[in-house]
């Protein structure tokens, strides 16, 4: 199998792209398109050229619906150990706007989003991406790019401290992980966030 990924934008010459993909022997594409309707437009074109299409969906980190959710539900965003929400701050890059998985509303939002894509006729599959928290430690090769050193887990990049997550953890384990000298070393807290 020979696959690639591609950002789809309405108006692009997707037919010629699929023709080139077919000519070089590509079998499929993980397509990142803004809406289910964009997939409905792209799939027949790709299939005409023998190309399978998987929807490439960002889940915990928002992409196409980021601004809308920031405006309507800022309380849905993940919070770092310093108490800062991604609704109000950034982690590394501006597009890192991860949601908090402890919130039932967030889980329902993601479920409905995936369901909408599952209903797209002809879609061959779905690839889920960014189904996690912000990177707590980046690869060492990226440290100079961001002007940071991450020789341990630092509070500014340690996410998963949304008040609802803290409440649920305390309910299960009887304490607030922030009471630890270094919460990143608390095995129960680490496992809880997995």
Predicted feature descriptions by range:
Residues 24, 45-49, 116-124:
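A structural motif corresponding to the C-terminal end of an alpha-helix
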Residues 9-38, 120-123:
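Catalytic domains of carbohydrate-active enzymes, especially glycoside hydrolases
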Residues 43-91, 127-135:
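Glycine-rich, aromatic-flanked loop segments that form ligand/cofactor-binding clefts
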Residues 14, 39, 106, 110:
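Aromatic/hydrophobic pocket-lining residues that form the small-molecule binding cavity
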Residues 1-6, 12, 20, 188-194:
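Conserved structural scaffold segments of CAZyme catalytic domains across common CAZy folds
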Residues 2-6, 29-31, 53-57, 126-128:
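Hydrophobic faces of well-ordered beta-strands that scaffold small-molecule active sites
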Residues 88-194:
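Polysaccharide-binding and catalytic clefts of secreted carbohydrate-active enzymes
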């Amino acid at each position: 199998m020979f696959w690639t990924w591609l950002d789809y934008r309405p108006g692009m010459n997707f037919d010629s792209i699929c023709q080139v993909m077919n000519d070089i022997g590509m079998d499929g594409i993980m397509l990142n398109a803004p809406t289910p309707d964009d997939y409905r437009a792209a799939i027949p074109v790709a299939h005409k050229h023998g190309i399978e299409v998987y929807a490439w969906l960002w889940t915990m980190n928002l992409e196409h619906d980021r601004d809308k959710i920031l405006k309507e539900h800022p309380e849905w965003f993940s919070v770092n150990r310093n108490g800062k929400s991604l609704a109000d701050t950034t982690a590394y890059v501006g597009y890192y706007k991860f949601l908090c998985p402890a919130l039932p509303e967030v889980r329902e939002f993601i479920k409905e989003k995936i369901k909408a894509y599952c209903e797209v006729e002809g879609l061959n599959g779905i690839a889920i991406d960014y189904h996690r928290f912000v990177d707590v430690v980046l690869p060492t090769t990226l440290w100079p790019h961001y002007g940071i050193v991450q020789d341990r887990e630092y509070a500014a990049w340690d996410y998963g401290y949304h008040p609802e997550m803290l409440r649920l953890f305390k309910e299960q384990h009887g304490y607030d992980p922030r009471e630890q000298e270094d919460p990143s070393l608390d095995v129960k807290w680490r496992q809880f966030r997995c």
